[in-house]
Amino acid sequence: MRNPNQCSWYPARVLCAVVVFAAMTVSFSPSTRAESWGGIQPLKSRRIDVERLLGKPLNEPSGDESTLHFNVAGGSVTVSFVNAKFVVNKKLQPALEGTVLQIVLQHENSSDTPDSMNLLKNRDFDRQDERDITVFRNLKGGVTYTFITGKLRTTRYSASADQLVRARK
């Protein structure tokens, strides 16, 4: 004999599973969020978060300077912050002042290549070549890789295009 309660809940369960899957797909899609590095996220993390994760900076910014420099294993990191002038010029929400604008990693001896990072066939990245410099940009994800003579030298993390649109007033 069949349990009538078992069948009546089945369509609701399926619908719920589909809705949850769709919500997770949208929230974790690369076009809706920026790449982060070491727990630091553009337009979300603040200076206190950066210092908690990376330690004391090499410099103490003065005046309008809004960048911090750190030494890390394998190179150095420069973290830039959103300042009041940037908020006004880009017509951003005032609450974003003081959040991370960009993270720049300078790699000293990286062995990564475009091929080893699977960038050559990745359609999310735009490629630009100039002499011995190759740049791969993903504006939707907010990440840019710069290779010099085939080796990774710089990685830049910034807000994604969608994040910047949502950050406007």
Q: Residue locations for each model-derived region?
A:
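General structural signal for secondary-structure boundaries
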Residues: 11-12, 19-20, 110-115
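Bacterial N-terminal signal peptides
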Residues: 15-27
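Bacterial N-terminal signal peptides that target proteins for export
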Residues: 2-18
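Short, contiguous acidic and Ser/Thr-rich linear segments
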Residues: 40-44
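Generic anion/oxyanion-binding catalytic loop in active/binding sites
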Residues: 23, 32, 39
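A cross-family detector of function-defining hotspots
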Residues: 35, 45-169
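Sec/Tat signal peptide C-region and signal peptidase I cleavage site
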Residues: 28-34
